[in-house]
A protein has these predicted regions:
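Acidic/hydrophobic-patterned starts of short beta strands in beta-sheet-rich repeat architectures
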Residues: 12-21, 70-79, 141-150
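Blade-edge motifs of beta-propeller repeat domains
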Residues: 1, 32-58, 91-129, 162-171
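Hydrophobic beta-strand residues in large extracellular and virion-surface proteins
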Residues: 5, 18-20, 26, 76, ...
């Protein structure tokens, strides 16, 4: 997989932001300035967005339909080939859904990104592909949605929800 780096006018000065293609989106890195040594400084990546865009969760998305945030509307929680776990909030109703753009689901405060590294049966070219396949269920019977995942790491993992019904927090 190869990404192309595209310079993009920042609109603030004569310096360029960068747009770089990734598995789940195109990302914009805003130019922030220079270090004292003269190296450029860029922001953390932010997805490039499109108005009224269709839902997009990356390649080989594995969706689950579940009321993730306890508001009564069915949301989508999905894994993708990159190894990310994504949440699409339903801002509408179950009969007329209106999904927000995806948010990364976190565990322990960090976005979930499960990849095998170089210990994968498919070989080193698959090291960065997690092929995350989540199943949302109440694993421990506490009334909160938990997540069981599998993928290219060739093992199952259970992520228990230690948050609340309205604000899930996986560990």
């Amino acid at each position: 997989y190869s990404s192309r780096v595209i310079p993009y006018p920042s609109g603030r000065n004569d310096r360029q932001d960068l747009i770089i293609g990734g598995e789940a989106a195109m990302y914009r890195y805003r130019f922030l300035g220079f270090t004292p040594e003269g190296a450029p400084i860029y922001s953390d990546p932010a997805p490039v967005l499109q108005r009224n865009a269709p839902l997009y969760g990356g390649s080989l998305t594995v969706p689950n339909v579940v009321d993730w945030d306890g508001d009564g509307a069915l949301d989508i929680v999905a894994g993708n080939s990159e190894g990310r776990l994504l949440f699409f909030k339903n801002r509408g109703t179950n009969t007329e859904p209106d999904f927000a753009r995806s948010e990364e689901v976190c565990a322990g405060g960090s976005p979930i990104l499960l990849r095998p590294g170089y210990h994968v049966v498919q070989g080193p070219f698959e090291a960065s592909w997690g092929y995350l396949c989540p199943t949302v269920c109440d694993w421990n019977g506490d009334g909160l949605p938990d997540v069981v995942v599998s993928g290219s790491r060739a093992k199952f993992e259970v992520m228990l929800n230690r948050g609340t019904r309205e604000k899930p927090e996986l560990d």
